[in-house]
Amino acid sequence: MLSSKLSRRSFVQLAGAATLVAASGAAIPSNAFGKDAADWDAIVEAARGSKVAWYGWGGSAPRNELITKTLAPRLKEKYDIELELVGMDINNILTQLSGEFQAGLTEDGGSIDFIWINGENFASAKANGYLWGPFAQDLPNVQDYVDTEAADIAYDFGTPVEGYEAPYGKAQMVFWVDGAQIPQNETPIDPETFLQFCQDHPGMVTYPEPGDFTGTAIISCLIAGVEGKEEFEKLATMTEPSEDEVRAIVAPGMEYLRSLNPYLWKQGKTFPADSTTVHQMYADGELIMDAGYGEPQTDVDNGLLPATTRSFVLDTGTVGNTNYMAIAANAPHKEAAMVAINEVLSPDYQLTRYKTLGSITVLDLDRLSEEDRAAFDAVELGCAQLPLDVKLEHAIAEACGPVIPVLEKIWHDEVPGK
């Protein structure tokens, strides 16, 4: 899943950059580097012998290992491209881009080729002209396997993608319990049974205080269950929301959240500060349910959670989002970046990510060959993992970036201690 270090919480205001970039004309069309974007063979040939730098949050050792041991050798063998993986906080990446543009290092004079990015970071970088494109529509694997019109691909937390980034992976909220304590028929499936579960286990359920991105996602799942997917997803494209508009949509959901309070930890008068605290409370047995972006299979494998851990999503759905890859406007190796991104989107590498990391693929499963689809279906899952199609069928688009702080304010005004 996409780390919180690369989430909407990492948004950076790059003061003065918009004027600078607009003046320099940094938003370059995808065929402006002298290659016909329709001639993929020419792009591949131009990329040969390049060293391409992929920047992004580097805190996931399993992801880093997969890239260096699987993707990098593949790029070298197939295309003679050397992949350099650079771990860096997204704030520092955008600051580095800003500094390069202010120093006049535009077009192909930068140090960053492509970036792992999403949310407000993408919105900021795109608005300031730090991203090159549109390019995604020219990638063969996008053309063949990605539904670019799907809302969770075409919009990145409400910002139109418009070909300035290509999808990398998806993250979706999942709940889990210890199956040795909670029978299958007692697992919540919707807001009504979630309330009953809290009543049956008073004081042993809670969620992080919204403001923590997991806490906001949990209340979003429950609000969406109350409101219905269609009504909740209005928040996914509301790019200039007023508080009154958001309140009108989420009012029944907030009423429901208040109804949970008497049965929550501390009677809902206070909430844990963050998801790390909640995870520890669950591991210590203080709570009977936990949740997060993606299943806790790694914790089960490492002995931190029991092998009886069982994950689930609500029948009414759980929220999720997509993370992406974008090319810097001043990338020195744009062709190599395109080839590398295209390889990441190959069915084979997406399958490898699913097998190794449990990452939800961004490929449209219905567009895969029978052989590739069967390979995804045949992946052996751990005890705490859910089948890919179960998650995809229950996915709900998250509220867009500008809505999030409004939603959190409404929760703070209307729910704790009420």
Positions of PLM-derived features:
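N-terminal secretory signal peptides
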Residues: 1-10, 14-25, 31-32
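C-terminal segment of N-terminal export signals and the immediately downstream linker at the start
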Residues: 26-50
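Conserved C-terminal helix/tail region of periplasmic/extracytoplasmic solute-binding proteins
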Residues: 36, 280, 384-418
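Short, polar/charged alpha-helical segment
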Residues: 39-48, 55, 60-82, 175
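Extracytoplasmic ligand-binding site segments that recognize negatively charged/polar headgroups
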Residues: 57-70, 86-94, 108, 112-276
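A ligand-binding cleft/hinge motif common to bilobed small-molecule-binding domains
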Residues: 122-124, 289-307
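Periplasmic-binding protein-like
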Residues: 257-260, 305-326
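Mature extracytoplasmic/periplasmic domains
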Residues: 318-319, 323-391
